[in-house]
C-alpha cells in the first residue's frame, strides 16, 4: 500500500466541502495527521466509526477490549461535539456503508489512517475501490507509526527481521512533530441529519448490547484525556526510573499506555516528542538511559508492526518453518489450569489472576507465563496467543504475535533457546512477594521464601485450596530441549 493510498486526490476547491473521517485505530482528534490535512481543505469534517461484526464476532475478541473501545468512542464523540461536529456510529460493513453514507450526505470524499494488519489492508482496498467507483475522493495517511513500513529498510531495500539493526536505523530517522488540533469544525445540518435515518446511525451502544460482559474497572480510563493524564503522570513519576522499575510487576513502573496506543487514543508522535522534552530536562545519565530504554520500547512496537505488514503470514503461525512440525503436547487440562491460574506455581497463577480480573498483565509476567506454557507445559504457543487476545484489553495482533513468537523462539529476531525458571523469575522480580500476595491473597500469610520458590507444603496448599504443581519444571525443560533439538 506504500506510504499513502490516494486513489482520487482531494482537491483544494470543491462544491461539496464535507469530508468524512473514517476512524478505526485512531480514536482521537489531538495530533491526528489525516484530520489536520483535511482541515486545511474544509472545516466541515464529520467522524465515522463502523462497529464491524467481522471484528466484534471474531474468536479473538476480548470483552475488556470492547469495553475500552466503547469508552473511547464516547470520549471521541464528546470531543467532536466540543469542536462543533459529530461522530457518526454504525454497526455495519464499512465496504457497504461508507459509499452510501458519502453519497447520502453529498460528501466530497473520505479520509482515513492506514493499518498494518492483514484484515485491515484487505478491507481498506475494498472500501477504496467502492468509493472510487462512485467518484469519491480518497486520502490516507500512516498515522499509527512514526515511520511507515516502506521507510525503514535494510541497505538491500528489504524489511528488517532483527530488532537491533532496525532500532539503529529507526532511531536515526527524522521524526515528525505532533500536528495541531483544529480549534473548530462544522457538523451536519438538520436537513443532512434527517437523510441519515435509512442508514440507521446508532447511539454508542452499551457493552451488553454487543453481547459482551465486563464489569471490572479498566486499568486505564478510556479516551484522550485519560491517556494524556497518564502520560503526564508517567513523565513526572516513572520515566526517569523506567529502566530500573519496569521489570517489577508490584511497582507502577510502566506507562500503561498500551491500550491507548492500540486504539490510537494517543499518537506515537506525541509520545516521542514527550521523550525528547524529558531528555532535555533530565539531569543524569541514569535518567537519560531510562528515557532511551522507553524509546526502544516504542521502536519494538513499530518493529512488530513492520514485520506483520511485510510478512502477514506471521499471523497464521511460526515464522521459522521447522516449528511448523514441533511435537506439542495436547493436554487440555494443563491448558485450562494455565488459563485459570491453577498451575501450582504462584508467580504464574498470580499473573493469570491479574489478566483474568483486570484485562491486563505486566509485561515481565507476560514473558514468564508464555515461557511456562511453551517450555514447561510444552503446549502450542498459538493457544496462549489466542487466549491473550481473548482477555487483554490492550490486545494488539502485531505486538501479541511478536511477543509469543519471541518466547517460542519461532519468530522474528529469535533469541537463543531461553527457558525462564518461574521460581527464579519470582525471586528476581517479586523479591518481597508483594505481587503474588496481591493477586493470590489466599497465600498472603505464607513465608515469602516459600512463595517465591513454590516450596509450600502439601498441607499448606490444602489449607487454602491451592493446587500442587501440575508439572516439574526441571523435568519439563529437559523434555522441551530434547524436542527442540529435533526440529531446530
From Swiss-Prot:
The entry's DNA-binding residues are 246, 425
Q: What UniProt keywords are attached to this protein's entry? A: Chromophore, DNA damage, DNA repair, DNA-binding, FAD, Flavoprotein, Lyase, Nucleotide-binding
State which Enzyme Commission number(s) the record gives: 4.1.99.3
Pfam families, per the entry = DNA_photolyase (PF00875), FAD_binding_7 (PF03441)
> Where is the region Interaction with DNA?
297-304, 363-364
Marked site positions, Electron transfer via tryptophanyl radical: 328, 381, 404
Which catalysed reactions does the entry list for this protein?
Answer: cyclobutadipyrimidine (in DNA) = 2 pyrimidine residues (in DNA)
Does the record bear rRNA processing in its keywords? no
Enzyme class label: lyase
Where do the annotations place FAD binding? Answer: 242, 254-258, 394-396
Say which family it is in. Belongs to the DNA photolyase class-1 family.
Question: Under which name does UniProt file this protein?
Answer: Deoxyribodipyrimidine photo-lyase
Species the sequence originates in: Synechocystis sp. (strain ATCC 27184 / PCC 6803 / Kazusa)
